[in-house]
Amino acid sequence: MEVLEMNACNIGKRLVELRGTKTQEEVAKAIGISTSALSMYERGSRVPRDNIKLRISSYYKEPISSIFFAQQKHET
């Protein structure tokens, strides 16, 4: 099984899904980033740097791999 980084659009969709009913302001403040940065990540116009990925993963209590990486099965 190969692990690949998801494209920015899929990462954005996953971040929106994780945020649920919380506001962007609430999540951004908790993570320590600007609301505009979180908005760009959620829209898929930017991918967070590794240190921000760690903060996001910690905040949502989700493994980095489940947020930012897709697993691709190879047929044999």
Per-segment meaning from a language model:
Residues 51-66:
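DNA major-groove recognition helix of helix-turn-helix/homeodomain DNA-binding modules
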Residues 16, 25, 54:
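Active-site phosphate/pyrophosphate- and oxyanion-stabilizing loops and adjacent acidic/basic residues
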Residues 1-21:
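A short, Lys/Arg-rich alpha-helix, primarily the initiator
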Residues 21-40:
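Short alpha-helical DNA-recognition segment
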Residues 34-37, 49, 63:
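Short coil turns linking two alpha-helices in DNA-binding domains
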